[in-house]
Amino acid sequence: GECCRDRRVSTIYIGGGTPSWLPEQYMELIQKQLRVSFDIDEAAEITVECNPGTLTGQKLMTYKACGVNRLSIGLQSTFDDELKLLGRVHTYEQFLRNYELARKAGFSNINIDLMSALPYQTTVKYLTSLKRVIALRPEHISAYSLIIEKGTPFYEKYRFDAVKREAGMRTECLPGEETEYEIYEKTKEVLEQNGYRQYEISNYAKAGYECRHNIGYWKRTDYLGMGLGAASLIDNVRYTNARDLFLYIEETSDIHAVSIEGVEHGMATNLHEQADVVSRNAQIEEYMFLGLRMNAGVTREDFAKCFSCS
């Protein structure tokens, strides 16, 4: 927390994998250490990503007791065959049980992730999932389209179809651009009819429940990443943490011994495998393409305020 000692933390997001896999006492320890190390706003948004297959009632009660006030639950689909195809460890029934437990634990700000453009998924099937989720009345819904990344098992399995889709050709199992566009438009229409306002390409929320943490990314506010390979943006220097587990543990074993001189001067320390100063032109480019992800867009006034120019 030394490099951010003069800053007040307004959001915390614990993700980057499956934090709900951790035994609850470790999440409690993490929350306590964050409060010792940082000046956290009393009204801070504190989110934990959750996999429905690794949640328990006890974990949820512990999260609530130690200050977590927002959950992001990776449901992805309400159909078990689609969940199996995605390699998820939960069933829809498990999700429903844990969603109810989250409400009983007192959580009043919950996001649910849904995924479209799955292999063999029809528009009707996807919309069925969407309507089932809406019926649960979460405060926030994230609706993403599946991106098949090269080098992943998913890509190896569907690479011929993925290549065809990239070339604009029809495929047997993956939806084409027209279908994806139809799903996107239908998603927006159905969600807005049910009181969810789109505020970013893939994100919809009831009034006042927009994800403040993600908005910070899109507005290029400074953020500090902790953990293997985590990224940070501090004073227009972008850092990437070491990806070597043993090196990371060694460098953070005595947190008071970690030098911040490199952070203050835009240089990589042993903890960072990379540190890049973001040029003014790159700052402007990022500000524009990230800002245009949001429905609010980019205003002349905000741009002038950020870059002292028009």
Q: Across the structure, where does each feature detected by a protein language model lie?
A:
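C-terminal scaffold of the Radical SAM
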Residues: 1-309
